[in-house]
Structure formats: structure tokens, C-alpha cells
Amino acid sequence: MHVLILGGGVVGVTSAYYLARAGHQVTVLERQPGAGLETSFANAGQVSPGYSAPWAAPGIPVKALRWLMMRHRPLVLWPRLEPRLYAWLTRMLANCTEEAYRRNKGRMVRLAEYSRDALRDLRTETGIAYDHREKGTLQLFRTRKQLDHVGDDTRVLDAYGVPYTVLDPAGCIAAEPALAAVRDVFVGGLRLPGDETGDAHLFTQRLAALCESLGVTFRYGTAIARLHHAGDRVTAVETADGALLRADAYVAALGSYTPALLRPLGIALPVYPVKGYSLTLPITDAEAAPVSTVMDETYKVAITRLGDRIRVGGTAELAGFSNALRGPRRETLARSVQDLFPAGGDLDKASFWTGLRPMTPDGTPIVGGTRVGNLFTNTGHGTLGWTMACGSGRLLADLVSGRAPEIASDDLALGRYAA
């Protein structure tokens, strides 16, 4: 079977890898000159099944109002006359109940754990290297209130058998020794030893090369104009230069840009771009830098070691498809890393980046078939595209191939929004 994958980010490329391994002829269309050059380029670097949780959670509406008042706020909302944004926010608010949070977090942890295992298998099979470490995540709490609410997450972790340890300040320092220099800043933490870190861009580029060795064709610099369809079948992809490309099956993995492509087919995909930012700074003192990932719970900022660099990622900005770099967001990221690892890296030499995360209202990606028989989606991963990429690609390959998936997947498909 010939499969056309639309999008060459980490999700599209992992989909290509598993489909090629399943014996399919695969072509990837990507508008950029290479793989992984948009949302996958400089993300936070976490592979964090244990930290997988929906943003829609009990108490979030009140917290969001408080965040919007903070100087270094983790949430930024630019007022816009955009009906799709407010429809998306309304759906998200509807998921801020205890029942919905448990259901959505359970789905996310299921896929993320599967994906982490798939990544480990892939690494064993191929020897792929991407500045990865297997040293866990430390969610760091600055306030007693944050620590007291840790049970909201550990109950779901217990249900899915995800290992964790709740730590006092001494335990946090044992996990991340550089925190000893700022021990008065935090009161405790939650350590997730099964989490990993790695450079998603480097991984995507190297996996694309492995895909080519399996016969996958990459057509870079190819922008997609629209899908042609007849009845319940896609018949072709029309590119920006007017070419028509045909296949037996099609996979939409265009991140935040997927809904606009599918809308003319009558498919309403509840995915909205949530803008994130990152700083990447060279390490100046290895002993003063993080060992793995530290998640600053107050500012919702992840600080990750990637080889000889520190990646600082965070912020949720609702600003449509704007890619403008905004100084206040840089200040928030800098504040977090300066608070926790003041001597670890050189901020004067930091690179500043932004990307658009494709978010769903319930936090769970949309992986599976659609009402158009030969069209599949693999999008909506939000902040967890890197965490969930391998599992989503492997799951998608099973679904396209007509094989029984290795994990429950009906509640990951678009149909859950019709339920």
C-alpha cells in the first residue's frame, strides 16, 4: 500500500518509520527544507510519560485567572475576535472536572507509557543517538500548597503502575545536586524515574535518514494546498505548485495546521495552536547544571539538559498562528533557570525560539481514522508530541495496516468528540 504522510515533524517521521517497517511504500510531504524544523525544532526535550496530564483540570479556571495577573505568567491570552478560539476554550473548560481529568489523564498516560517503550525499542533496534538521557523528571514545588496537591496526580500514576517518589528538599537535591545552591527556593518535589530526555530535532533528522534507508521518499519544500476527495475517499493531495499526488491512504500529521486542511472535507478537528517558547544556552559549569529535567511547577517551565546545552521551555500563549518572539516570554524562561540553576549556563549566549503546539481541549491527541475511509490523523499532541511520537506512529501503522493495535485506541480517535 502507498501511504502519503502530510507533515515531516517528529510525529510525521515516526509514522513514516513504522509504516515503512510494516512494509508500506511511504512518501512524506514537508513544506520546510528538512525534517523537524517547526514545532519539533527546539521543544523542551522531555520524554515524560509520568508528567503527561491535561491542562484541563479541576481548579484550572481559577488558576488561569491568577496566572494572567502574574508578571512571569505561564499563560498568556491575546484578545482575538476568533470564534474557533472561544469554542475551543469552552470545550476545554468542560473538561475541567474531576471525572474528565481522570479519564483524560488515563488516556494520555496509556499512550505516553506505550510510546516511551516504543522509543526504547527503536533505540535498541537502530542505535539512534540524540543526546538522550534516562534519568527521570523532577517536578519541583516552590509552595506547600503545590506539594499538598500532589495526590491529584499520584492517584492516576498508581492506577497505571507508573513509578514515582514524593521528595522532601533533601531528596530533590539528591536527584538534582545543583539545587543545593538554591535550597530555600523549593519545598519538595515529585520524581518520575521512568522519564527520559533527548533532542527531538536531532532525533527527527536522524530517524528521517533511517527512513530513507528503508525506502521512504521525502519531498521537502512541498507545501500542500488542499485534498481532493470523492465520496468517502481522498483521491489526491494538491500541492501549492498544482501537482496532484495520489496514494492508497493518507495521514494528516500537520500539527496545528491540520484542521484547516480537513475542514473542506467536513471534518472538524478541535485542535488549536498554543504557542510555546524556549531558550537554549550553553552549559558553563556541568556541576551547576541539571542532570535531567526539572519542571518548575510555579512557572510551568521545563529545564532540561541536552548534551552540553540547557533547554528551557514553557509558556502557553493563545495568539493564533503568530510566530512573533516576545521579550516578556524570554524573561519568564530566564527567571526560572536563573532561580534554579544560576551558574549552570550562559544566558547571554542563549538562542530564543517559539513554536506552535497543536492542542486539543481534553489534552489527548487525535490518532486514528476519520469518516473519510482512507484518511487518518496523527495530531493534537500539544506539549507532548515528543513524548508520544513513537507510540502514536506505531499505533497509527497498526491502524492503517488493519492490524489490532497493541493498546486500547478507540478513545484516541476523533470519534470521541461525537460521543
Curated annotation (Swiss-Prot):
EC number, as in UniProt: 1.4.99.-
CC cofactor: FAD
Signal peptide range: none
Pathway entry: Amino-acid degradation; D-alanine degradation; NH(3) and pyruvate from D-alanine: step 1/1
Binding site for FAD: 3-17
Organism domain of life: Bacteria
GO biological process, any: D-alanine catabolic process
Nucleotide-binding is among the record's keywords: no
The entry's keywords: FAD, Flavoprotein, Oxidoreductase
Cellular component, GO annotation: cytoplasm; plasma membrane
Molecular function GO terms recorded: D-amino-acid dehydrogenase activity
Catalytic activity, reaction form: a D-alpha-amino acid + A + H2O = a 2-oxocarboxylate + AH2 + NH4(+)
Enzyme class: oxidoreductase
Pfam families documented for this protein: DAO
PANTHER family the record matches: D-AMINO ACID DEHYDROGENASE (PTHR13847:SF280), SARCOSINE DEHYDROGENASE-RELATED (PTHR13847)
Family: Belongs to the DadA oxidoreductase family.
Function: Oxidative deamination of D-amino acids.
Name under which the protein is recorded: D-amino acid dehydrogenase
Recorded name of the encoding gene: dadA
